[in-house]
Amino acid sequence: MTQPVPRLSVPAALALGSAALGAAFATGLFLGRRCPPWRGRREQCLLPPEDSRLWQYLLSRSMREHPALRSLRLLTLEQPQGDSMMTCEQAQLLANLARLIQAKKALDLGTFTGYSALALALALPADGRVVTCEVDAQPPELGRPLWRQAEAEHKIDLRLKPALETLDELLAAGEAGTFDVAVVDADKENCSAYYERCLQLLRPGGILAVLRVLWRGKVLQPPKGDVAAECVRNLNERIRRDVRVYISLLPLGDGLTLAFKI
């Protein structure tokens, strides 16, 4: 049975997480003047368009991407559905948060080519472990040579089965409360179930990241019959009301929710 990793106190862990987000604002992920109250003012203060020169400047002055990670990102973008991959700025923020809380164990739901798994693995110590879940065996094999090139393959534990099965197996094996970070970027129909199980597997002070929580803007008014959009909208409301976590929903990529377990 896997032993729980040493736990930071909840206030300390949350303070660290807050510090990381503050650093992200300070170093350029969020530009412009001090953000106004969310109601009643028209001042624009968040992100420039991703195809703008200002956005490219932002990335060029903030990104520190491992060569193998960059190669894997470019390779992934060439694949069908490659644009659904975690963005480089999301990956770097999550990796920095993992370093900040001295993470050793991570969950990654939705491997694809393993870009997010590799980003996390590179942030963990030599004895760290990333359990990553995928149902299609082909995409991870595209990324495996680059996991090896980055000398991080030994940290990546690929589970080729439905993510819910892997999560239930981890819980049955007594690993509840032993993971430091969890990233959810899998099918949206099961996103609420993923959230609940990941929260059980996280230790207090652990970080749960949910990607694509804006679902191309469809969460505002899910189209009739769009089950995925409805599920994402419901999860957003669920997390907003969840007293077990502190949250931030960030406008990075297609939306990134960070939930810090209390």
From Swiss-Prot:
Cell compartments where the protein resides: Membrane
EC number: 2.1.1.-
Keyword Endoplasmic reticulum applies: no
Residues the entry annotates as binding S-adenosyl-L-methionine: 108, 110-111, 116, 134-135, 163, 185, 187, 194
CDD domains in the record: AdoMet_MTases (cd02440)
Source domain of life: Eukaryota
Keywords (A to Z) from UniProt: Membrane, Methyltransferase, S-adenosyl-L-methionine, Signal-anchor, Transferase, Transmembrane, Transmembrane helix
One Gene Ontology cellular component annotation held by this UniProt entry: mitochondrion
Major localisation: membrane
One Pfam family here: Methyltransf_3
Membrane topology: Single-pass type II membrane protein
Annotated GO MF terms: O-methyltransferase activity; S-adenosylmethionine-dependent methyltransferase activity
SUPFAM superfamilies, alphabetized: S-adenosyl-L-methionine-dependent methyltransferases
Regions that span the bilayer: 12-32
A Gene Ontology biological process term: methylation
Database matches in InterPro entries: Cation-dep_OMT (IPR050362), SAM-dependent_MTases_sf (IPR029063), SAM_O-MeTrfase (IPR002935)
Function: Putative O-methyltransferase.
Family that this chain belongs to: Belongs to the class I-like SAM-binding methyltransferase superfamily. Cation-dependent O-methyltransferase family.
Complexes and interactors: Homodimer.
Protein's name according to its UniProt entry: Catechol O-methyltransferase domain-containing protein 1
Organism: Homo sapiens
Gene field: COMTD1
